[in-house]
């Protein structure tokens, strides 16, 4: 049975690596194989195929509704409100369960996320809303580094996103018991300094936690404590078990399950709490039936049941972090008779390191020590005090306030120590991309040395480690980063870099420096920007200038706009050499302007190949450039002016540049329709790429010219460009 469960889990998990979403034809083929496999009693292969078939059928079924969106961007929907989270005072993020799309029912009812930038009336969870919204399939930025936005959305079960245009009707739902309880607790803890943290620990309401606090928790490794997760549900379940022992084994099981269910309900049945509750349910069923199963069998059953309950859970980082952490604990118990707390923490630190690097591209080196001290404080004092306070809040306000005050005092101590540590030390260490394979190989070698059956891995592991450390010659690379509707171009060689433009920043604090540029620089091991070029002052080009200047050293700044006294003004005729490349400023003729036509146009050449960065220049500047440069504008690759607007890319300019490759830096399904179809037609003799559709572009020199690799041309199905959700018989590039 255990190998069958493991086979099912492996089959289901393989969906993370599929290059495309298989069609029903593949499902039919798998079904036809099940009968002979069952006849031959090859159960491992049978359950492996069952896992694959389960994911294929479920993903195709749950994503099929996206076909109905078509090319239309505005839709009328009726949906049930799941949550409304304010992002500061800028907008409200609505989580909606859609029942009708354009007045037609939707099955199964999908989960979508809609941003509302206008004022909304107070709405209760469960209210039915009819609204008009832009709507597009789940999408995220696609770069070598930074969060995978699409996988993040799918991991939460969200399959489409949009912006609210207008509300047609709201049918308010009665205020639920959770909202009444939350209101009573909020009144009790309102005067306290750390009320938002108490709301997060008890009800999973995280909107009041600041970005600085999240950064602090990430650096200290305490994010898993603040965000309600399996650890919290397990703690409450254990508390219920302890209290229920007075009523015998089955009384303890019922009390434990009841406590876990109530806490999950308080947290709004968030995805992480649902997973933990199912694990508690699996364990409870086994204990109720008095089955004495080993821990790893319970682990396998929980994995399979969760996959059956919510196939999208496999795309959640929290799912893998929690299950891998439990697997490591089981392994420690197998290798050590009585492991100490420090041994457990060390194994968790090392075992989770590759996954943490893959997901977050950095480590918190002090996390083990901080967790050794903080976790007992939270589990023994802060969380129990806060939860008992919540239970008492509706009836005994003063007593609840006293308990909240004690929990708040503990939170104050923790934050004081963490802030002091953050002032003295760098808590979060972003690491270059090569750390991931290196740490994975080292961990594999260490594990093989510790566990006798795995020692055959030592030799191949050492050989792979040698290859990973073997130095390779550095050559220049150019990346047009996927920054949505904006521009950011990174030119690098080894650990040296020049950055051209910085992308946009948005209401609520989200910005392309923290989301894309800084992770990309860290991934490449770049710690200093040799030259920062800001083409002009528009926010989608210069929006993150201050953030970058504060985040890392910049040796020289060049711009067409005088941002500060340290900014060198960009002017035609400027030239310099850098790492074997020649840079020439072709425009503007007169510095100091801030309009599109004043943008800093730069031509980069290695003597054989050339790239033209054309900012947001339009017809007037293009005409003058053609007159000044003529055939000198000819370039191998062009980053199109003004994101592909029809006010730019005039036929004379297109003919003069005569690029073989053209990259349009434009957001996915942007409101301006960039690049415009007529502009795309003007470049019909060149290969064209759009960052919003195909992700970041990696440009490298080759003997034949320049190679362009799109981020969405590689990787699993959910990272692909085009209609990634559509099942296919075969992979289509």
Give names to the regions the model predicted.
Residues 15, 19, 32, 36, 174-189, 197, 205, 213, ...:
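Hydrophobic alpha-helical segments of integral membrane proteins
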Residues 3, 40-47, 162, 210-370, ...:
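Hydrophobic alpha-helical transmembrane segments in multi-pass membrane proteins
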Residues 22-32, 321-322, 371-379, 433-436:
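Alpha-helical transmembrane segments of polytopic membrane proteins
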Residues 78, 118-134, 152, 172-173, ...:
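Non-globular, low-confidence helical/coil segments that flank catalytic cores
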Residues 1-69, 73-74, 151, 161-168, ...:
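N-terminal leader/targeting segments
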Residues 51-224, 510, 515-524, 528, ...:
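Membrane-interface helix/helix-cap signal primarily in integral membrane proteins
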């Amino acid at each position: 049975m255990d190998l069958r469960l493991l086979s099912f889990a492996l089959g289901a998990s393989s969906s993370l690596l599929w290059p495309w979403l298989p069609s029903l034809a593949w499902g039919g083929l798998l079904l036809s194989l099940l009968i002979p496999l069952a006849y031959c009693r090859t159960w491992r292969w049978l359950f492996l195929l069952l896992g694959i078939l389960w994911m294929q059928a479920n993903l195709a079924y749950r994503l099929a509704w996206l076909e109905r969106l078509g090319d239309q961007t505005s839709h009328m929907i009726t949906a049930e409100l799941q949550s409304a989270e304010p992002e500061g005072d800028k907008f409200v993020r609505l989580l909606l369960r859609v029942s009708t799309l354009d007045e037609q029912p939707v099955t199964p009812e999908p989960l979508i996320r809609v941003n509302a930038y206008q004022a909304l009336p107070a709405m209760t969870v469960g209210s039915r809303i009819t609204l008009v919204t832009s709507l597009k399939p789940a999408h995220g930025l696609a770069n070598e580094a930074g969060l995978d936005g699409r996988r993040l959305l799918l991991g939460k079960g969200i399959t489409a996103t949009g912006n609210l245009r207008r509300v047609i009707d709201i049918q308010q739902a009665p205020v639920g018991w959770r909202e009444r309880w939350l209101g009573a607790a909020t009144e009790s803890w309102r005067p306290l300094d750390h009320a938002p943290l108490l709301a997060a620990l008890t009800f999973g309401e995280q909107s009041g936690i600041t970005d600085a606090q999240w950064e602090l928790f990430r650096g200290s490794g305490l994010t898993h404590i603040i965000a309600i997760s399996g650890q919290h549900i397990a703690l409450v379940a254990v508390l219920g078990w302890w209290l229920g022992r007075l009523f015998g084994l089955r009384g303890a099981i019922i009390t434990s399950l009841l406590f876990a269910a109530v806490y999950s309900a308080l947290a709004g049945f968030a995805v992480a709490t649902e997973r933990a509750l199912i694990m508690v349910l699996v364990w409870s069923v086994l204990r109720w039936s008095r089955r004495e199963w080993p821990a790893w069998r319970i682990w396998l059953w929980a994995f399979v049941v969760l996959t059956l309950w919510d196939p999208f859970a496999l795309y959640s980082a929290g799912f893998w972090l929690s299950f891998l952490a439990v697997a490591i604990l089981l392994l420690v118990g197998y290798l050590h008779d009585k492991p100490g707390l420090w041994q457990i923490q060390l194994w968790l630190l090392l075992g989770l390191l590759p996954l943490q690097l893959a997901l977050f591209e950095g480590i918190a080196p002090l996390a083990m020590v901080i967790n050794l001290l903080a976790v007992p404080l939270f589990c023994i004092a802060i969380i129990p005090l806060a939860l008992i306070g919540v239970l008492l809040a509706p009836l005994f306000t003063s007593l609840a306030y006293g308990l909240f005050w004690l929990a708040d005092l503990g939170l104050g101590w923790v934050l004081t120590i963490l802030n002091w540590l953050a002032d003295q030390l760098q808590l979060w260490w972003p690491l270059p991309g090569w750390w991931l394979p290196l740490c994975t190989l080292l961990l594999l070698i260490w594990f093989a040395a510790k566990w006798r059956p795995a020692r055959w891995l030592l030799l191949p592991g050492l050989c792979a480690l040698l290859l990973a450390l073997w130095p390779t010659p550095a050559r220049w690379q150019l990346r047009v980063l996927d920054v949505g509707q904006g521009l950011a171009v990174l030119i690098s060689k080894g650990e040296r870099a020049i950055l051209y433009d910085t992308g946009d920043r948005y209401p609520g604090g989200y910005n392309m420096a923290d989301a894309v540029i800084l992770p990309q620089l860290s991934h490449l091991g770049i710690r200093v920007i040799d030259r920062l070029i800001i083409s002009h002052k528009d926010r989608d080009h210069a929006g993150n200038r201050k953030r970058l200047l504060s985040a890392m050293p910049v040796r020289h700044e060049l711009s067409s706009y005088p941002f500060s006294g340290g900014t060198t003004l960009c002017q035609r005729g400027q030239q310099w050499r850098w790492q074997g490349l020649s840079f020439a400023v072709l425009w503007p003729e007169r510095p100091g302007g801030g309009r599109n036509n004043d943008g800093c146009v730069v031509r980069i050449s290695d003597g054989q190949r050339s790239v033209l960065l054309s900012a947001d220049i339009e017809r007037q500047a293009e005409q003058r450039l053609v007159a000044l440069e003529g055939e000198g504008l000819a370039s191998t690759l062009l980053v199109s002016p003004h994101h592909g607007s029809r006010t730019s890319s005039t036929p004379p300019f297109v003919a003069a540049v005569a690029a073989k490759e053209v990259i349009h830096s434009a957001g996915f399904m942007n409101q301006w329709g960039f690049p415009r179809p007529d502009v795309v037609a003007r470049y019909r003799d060149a290969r064209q790429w759009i960052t919003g559709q195909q992700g970041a572009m990696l440009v490298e020199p080759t003997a034949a010219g320049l190679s362009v690799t799109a981020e969405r041309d590689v990787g699993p199905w959910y990272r692909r460009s085009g209609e990634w959700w559509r099942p296919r018989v075969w992979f289509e590039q």
